[in-house]
C-alpha cells in the first residue's frame, strides 16, 4: 500500500484537498495519507466534510507540527512558509513501521495512475540501498553552475524535491533530522531554494533517478503549451510562479487540471486565492480586456469568485 506524505499550513488546505482528490480518482487500490501541518484542526474538519469524495483512502492521519523557535532560512518577505521544512522532522511523527513514503508538494496534480511505477521505485530503492528517489532538475553546465557552486556540490545533478520517494527505514537509521538541521545552519546564508537546497547538499547526487513523468514540471513560460502532457505523465507539478489558483494562472490552459479536481470535491467551479488585492484586480481587468475570460468555462462565475476573493482579502 502506498503511503503519501504532505507537509503544509493553512494557506494550502484547499490545494492539498485538490491534490488528494486527483490521487484518489486515479488510483485503483487504497492508499494511506500522512499530513504534517502547523494547525491541522480546520483541515481535519474540511476533510470530514468531503470524505465521501475520497473513497480510495484507507487511512489518513494528521500531525500538528510542534517544533517552536526554529530559525528557518530564506522566509522573510517570501511567499514560502516554514511548512516547506516540516519534512525534515518526519521521523518524529510518522509511524516507525512504515517502509516507504511518497512525499508530494501541494502544487501537484495526479492525472494518470502512478501506482505501478511508484511500487517499482520503492522496491528499487530498497534493493539498491538509496535513501530517496527524485527527478533531476538541473544538470551542471554553463547555465546552471551557479547552483552547484553556491552549495559547493561535488556531483553533477540537482533534484527537484516536489516529489520524493523515501526509504523511511533508512532515513530513520541515518537520523536525518539532526543531520539536515545541522547542515541547514551551516549553509544558512547560501540557501535560495529552501529545504530543497538542504536536501541536495545532503544527498549531493546520491539518489535514485525517477522519471520526469512523476514530476512533470510546468514552469511559467511553458504552462500554456500542453503538447508534452500525455498518457505517460502521472504527476504534473505547477512549479512556476503563475499557480493555477491565481487569476493570472487560470488564464493558462494547464490550470484546467487543478481546477477540474478542485471542482470534483468541492462542487465549486474555481478556487482563486490572492495575497495582494491591487495586483489581483489588475490581473482580473487584464484577463477581461484581453478576452481570455471567454476562453474558460463558466466565465461569469469566475468573475464573481475573483471579486469575492479580492474584496475579502485584507491586503
Where are these regions (language model features)?
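A short, conserved beta-to-alpha structural element at the edge of catalytic cores
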Residues: 127-152, 242-245, 250, 254-260
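Short, charged/polar "capping" segments at the starts of alpha-helices
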Residues: 39-46
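Active-site-proximal specificity loops/subdomain of glycosyltransferases
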Residues: 53-93
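Short, acidic, metal-binding catalytic loop of nucleotide-sugar glycosyltransferases
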Residues: 22-30
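N-proximal low-complexity "stem/linker" segments adjacent to membrane-targeting elements
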Residues: 1-21
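Short internal beta-strands
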Residues: 32-38, 134
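A glycosyltransferase accessory/donor-loop signature
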Residues: 2, 8, 166-315
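GT-A fold catalytic core of metal-dependent nucleotide-sugar glycosyltransferases
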Residues: 68, 83-142, 158, 165
Amino acid at each position: 500500500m502506498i503511503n503519501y506524505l504532505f507537509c503544509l499550513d493553512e494557506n494550502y488546505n484547499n490545494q492539498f484537498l485538490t491534490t488528494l482528490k486527483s490521487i484518489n480518482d486515479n488510483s485503483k487500490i487504497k492508499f494511506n495519507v500522512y499530513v504534517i501541518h502547523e494547525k491541522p484542526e480546520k483541515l481535519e474538519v474540511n476533510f470530514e466534510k468531503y470524505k465521501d469524495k475520497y473513497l480510495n483512502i484507507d487511512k489518513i492521519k494528521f500531525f500538528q507540527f510542534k517544533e517552536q523557535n526554529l530559525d528557518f532560512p530564506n522566509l522573510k518577505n517570501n511567499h514560502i512558509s516554514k511548512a516547506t521544512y516540516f519534512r525534515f522532522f518526519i521521523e518524529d511523527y510518522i509511524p516507525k513501521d512504515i517502509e516507504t513514503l511518497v512525499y508530494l508538494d501541494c502544487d501537484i496534480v495526479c492525472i494518470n495512475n502512478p501506482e505501478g511505477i511508484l511500487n517499482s521505485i520503492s522496491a528499487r530503492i530498497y534493493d539498491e540501498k538509496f535513501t530517496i528517489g527524485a527527478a533531476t532538475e538541473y544538470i551542471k553546465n554553463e547555465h546552471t553552475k551557479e547552483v552547484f557552486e553556491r552549495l559547493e556540490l561535488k556531483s553533477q545533478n540537482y533534484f527537484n524535491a516536489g516529489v520524493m520517494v523515501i526509504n523511511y527505514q533508512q532515513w530513520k537509521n541515518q537520523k536525518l533530522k539532526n543531520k539536515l538541521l545541522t547542515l541547514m545552519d551551516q549553509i544558512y546564508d547560501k540557501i535560495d531554494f529552501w529545504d530543497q537546497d538542504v536536501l541536495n547538499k545532503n544527498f549531493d547526487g546520491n539518489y535514485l533517478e525517477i522519471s520526469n513523468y512523476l514530476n512533470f514540471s510546468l514552469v511559467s513560460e511553458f504552462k500554456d503549451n500542453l503538447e508534452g502532457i500525455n498518457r505517460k505523465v502521472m504527476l504534473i507539478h505547477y512549479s512556476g510562479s503563475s499557480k493555477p489558483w491565481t487569476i493570472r494562472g487560470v488564464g493558462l490552459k494547464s490550470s484546467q487540471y487543478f481546477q477540474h479536481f478542485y471542482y470534483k470535491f468541492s462542487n465549486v467551479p474555481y478556487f482563486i486565492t490572492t495575497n495582494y488585492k491591487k495586483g489581483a484586480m489588475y490581473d482580473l481587468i487584464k484577463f477581461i480586456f484581453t478576452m481570455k475570460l471567454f476562453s474558460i468555462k463558466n466565465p461569469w462565475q469566475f468573475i464573481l469568485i475573483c471579486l469575492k476573493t479580492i474584496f475579502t482579502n485584507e491586503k
